[in-house]
């Protein structure tokens, strides 16, 4: 999980979701997991 100021989709499989007022990226590739800090 990478915590970043700006999150964006890295590949086509990345999905942008909102969880507890946080924007997160979930993907089939575990390296692409991100969360907005």
From Swiss-Prot:
GO terms for biological process: translation. One of its GO terms (molecular function) is structural constituent of ribosome. One of its GO terms (cellular component) is ribosome. InterPro entries: Ribosomal_bL36 (IPR000473), Ribosomal_bL36_sp (IPR035977). Keywords: Chloroplast, Plastid, Ribonucleoprotein, Ribosomal protein. HAMAP family: Ribosomal_bL36. Belongs to the bacterial ribosomal protein bL36 family. This is Large ribosomal subunit protein bL36c.
């Amino acid at each position: 999980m990478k915590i970043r100021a700006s999150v964006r989709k890295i590949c086509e499989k990345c999905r942008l979701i909102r969880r507890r007022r946080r924007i997160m990226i979930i993907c089939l590739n575990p390296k692409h997991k991100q969360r907005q800090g």
